[in-house]
Amino acid sequence: MKLKISFLPTFLIFLISLDSVTAQEICFSGFFKPNSTYDLNRRQILSTLSSNVTSHNGFFNSKFGQAPNRVFINGMCIPGTKPETCSDCIKGASDKISESCPNKTDAYTWPDCCMVRYSNVSFSGSLVMEPSETLYHTGDIEDTGTNLTVFDRIWEELMLRTITAASLSSSNGSSFGQKYFAAEVASLTTFQTMYAMMQCTPDVSSKDCEFCLKTSVGDYESCCRGKQGGAVIRPSCFVRWDLYPYAGAFENVTFPPPPPQSLPQPPVSLIPPPVSDRANTTIKGIIVAIVVPIIVILVSLVVLLVVCRRKKSYKTTEVQATDEITTTHSLQFSFKTIEAATDKFSDSNMIGRGGFGEVYRGKLSSGPEVAVKRLSKTSGQGAEEFKNEAVLVSKLQHKNLVRLLGFCLEGEEKILVYEFVPNKSLDYFLFDPAKQGELDWTRRYNIIGGIARGILYLHQDSRLTIIHRDLKASNILLDADMNPKIADFGMARIFGVDQSQANTRRIAGTFGYMSPEYAMRGHFSMKSDVYSFGVLVLEIISGKKNSSFYNIDDSGSNLVTHAWRLWRNGSPLELVDPTIGESYQSSEATRCIHIALLCVQEDPADRPLLPAIIMMLTSSTTTLHVPRAPGFCLSGRDLEQDGVEYTESTSRSIPGSINDASITEFYPR
């Protein structure tokens, strides 16, 4: 009976706060006309998918029809699913995805025990990370009475264990057995267990599976830490954890023993005390029975606190030790591998050039395309910038940050290998009159939100506090779906746990994006990145470079001051890029301009931090402060007269290049 009473409050909390983590149908990419050839092919292959999956040991990958109306499809169930359950899940998912995505060429869904995906392009064997969806319970873990520090430790251990088990697993030959699946459990308390399930599509590599799962866990942690459960779904992988078993995935899992209890009390003496002392002894016994457990608990908490602090201290030391990147063997490529990928650094593969070297497009023997940043042997700052970027970016995992795949350090060769981002950089579209039309308001608004989430990760949600110091349009890459990825961490700096700002005499960055306190005094902080973000938002909305306003008149105007004048005159929407037309929400655009003006306030204390910015962008009910006049920037010449060593960063690219932002050039003014 005690067991039932102890479990009941937690169970009731789930009934009250559960926000379903059942995966939604994700529709994306292009459109097709109803009853077109593609639509008929899609319906046909979806109608037979359930029987094909059950007859192919739980995984079916096929195509149907002729190009350009060919449909590619995946269907799979979790290992151990009964054939009838698998069939029902696939059929239900196929029907739901067909209804929810009536005219989209690409879609996928991950219900509890199966997955369905279709597309008009082949995706077999390819790691596909986006679009993704994060779901979570609305209840907080602290509502269950669980200590959050203890929970975090157990949760992280469970996630790492499940990632390892899933990415290294292979088919065991059992019914519907598949590789890249794991279901693990961990005891949170005597009466409470955590359940984690992860799965990748079996057509990707083990390394890609591990990356997909780690990224998903990182995304959940950034979004929903402290919640009572949740899931992250991607086209190539699925992560879910909860405080109760689900999907029938844990029937054969061995449950771990409960966490150790308090130390036992000392044995009671069997020799009876004298009769005259029995009353006193009884009182003493009661006191001992109460005090000893309290002391044990307090000592345990103190030990736990000390261990946690030592652990944090150790992690900080370990991070600084990684400055010697030759120890990072898991990320290292051989020079021969890079040469082969780029056809010996052929000019035809060069996609960018700058003061620190060149950027090449390459293709690894394992399949994926990469962007290879080869630092110049004669660059005086090359080694330091290389170390900085390699150490920083290798630790960053977020969908709005460019992904570092590895590096090469052999002799004088210093090379960084990044994921290949096909749609060039934001400035390529934003400032080209012929390309601006491709950025409608919806895309621009999504780009603003994605950049904000990427900066939030750098400032708060990653294990390091990182100040980018060079946020600008040419350092924002756009993937195939025009999602933004922050790039170029050559100037980034790590802050300590309690550090809020730092100073430098060498001002490095891009004029126009620098905050006044950084440009004039060398002070940089999270608020200086916020200033750069504000300028970037104004550029995205207007389609104009901040620098394009210089020398127009003698007023010293720039985009920031121009936006402020329009705001003050009650006509902020005059800032909106005319190529957008009328297809935007005026309230949404006005709100974004308002947020940008708050970000470029002269006093750093008046600028919002990223959590507040995200809230402002996503909630129309959040009240915004009235902006004051923004900070005014001096020219580079003025800075030199003030005795500040000033270095501006610019980007140069080969005409027709794929990736303008992969290299940054620095030169003295």
Curated annotation (Swiss-Prot):
Signal sequence bounds:
1-23
GO MF entry, a single one: protein serine/threonine kinase activity
Positions of post-translational Phosphotyrosine modification: 418, 518
Pfam families in the record: PK_Tyr_Ser-Thr (PF07714), Stress-antifung (PF01657)
Entry EC no(s): 2.7.11.1
- InterPro entries hit by this protein: GNK2, GNK2_sf, Kinase-like_dom_sf, Prot_kinase_dom, Protein_kinase_ATP_BS, Ser-Thr/Tyr_kinase_cat_dom, Ser/Thr_kinase_AS
Example GO biological process term?
Answer: defense response to bacterium
**Positions of the catalytic residues:** 470
Task: List the GO terms this entry assigns under cellular component, sorted alphabetically.
Answer: plasma membrane
Domain Protein kinase spans what residues?
345-624
Q: Where are the transmembrane segments?
A: 286-306
Q: Which residues take part in binding ATP?
A: 351-359, 373
Q: Topological domain, Extracellular: which ranges?
A: 24-285
Could you tell me which residue ranges are on the Cytoplasmic side of the membrane? 307-669
Q: What is this protein called?
A: Cysteine-rich receptor-like protein kinase 34
